[in-house]
């Protein structure tokens, strides 16, 4: 979804992207390579340390690393918010406030690119995670221009072993000339 967002938005020069749950920074580095200024957020210091070591010197002035839960992060206005397989790891009790903050951070014309997990995912019983059904996804995206929305189910692997994946790949744009209330 990140590549699709970058293709739609073009070069990032002078614009802000947020990478929520950036991990070791592979996607963050791709954004830097495309000229974006990036706020990279992750709760794991080890991942941020790996990212820090990989930042090209020429890009160092365009990146800010934040070691925090993205549910606790204060998100600045952004032209692109990327959340690659990270938002489901927000506890369901905190997800509504996080999603509201994401919506508020999207400037007019900005794109959200990311994934959410569906209710048939094998991890759906985990109380520390968030899962949505199709109607909830529709409600979350209300007011955004949905550019792509793909629901998929497959059996595969996760870090913990075999897993049934139920995912929603989302690419959605804040309408031009429309700021989310409170923005």
Predicted feature descriptions by range:
Residues 82:
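A conserved beta-strand element that flanks and buttresses the S-adenosyl-L-methionine
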Residues 20:
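Conserved beta-strand/loop positions that form the S-adenosyl-L-methionine
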Residues 1-12, 23-74, 94-97, 111-183:
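Class I (Rossmann-like) S-adenosyl-L-methionine-dependent methyltransferase catalytic domain
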């Amino acid at each position: 979804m990140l590549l699709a967002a970058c293709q739609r938005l073009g070069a990032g020069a002078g614009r802000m992207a947020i990478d929520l749950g950036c991990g070791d920074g592979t996607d963050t580095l791709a954004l830097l390579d495309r000229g974006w200024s990036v706020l990279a957020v992750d709760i794991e210091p080890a991942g941020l340390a790996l990212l820090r070591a990989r930042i090209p010197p020429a890009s160092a002035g365009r990146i800010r690393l934040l070691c925090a839960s993205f549910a606790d992060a204060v998100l600045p206005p952004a032209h692109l918010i990327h959340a690659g397989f990270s938002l489901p790891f927000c506890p369901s009790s905190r997800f509504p406030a996080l999603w509201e903050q994401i919506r508020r951070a999207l400037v007019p014309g900005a794109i959200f690119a990311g994934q959410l997990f569906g209710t048939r995912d094998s991890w759906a019983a985990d109380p520390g995670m968030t899962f949505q059904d199709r109607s909830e996804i529709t409600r979350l995206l209300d007011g955004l221009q949905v550019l792509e929305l793909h629901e998929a189910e497959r059996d595969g692997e996760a870090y913990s072993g075999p897993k049934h994946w139920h995912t929603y790949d989302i690419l959605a744009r804040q309408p031009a000339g429309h700021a989310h209330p409170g923005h």
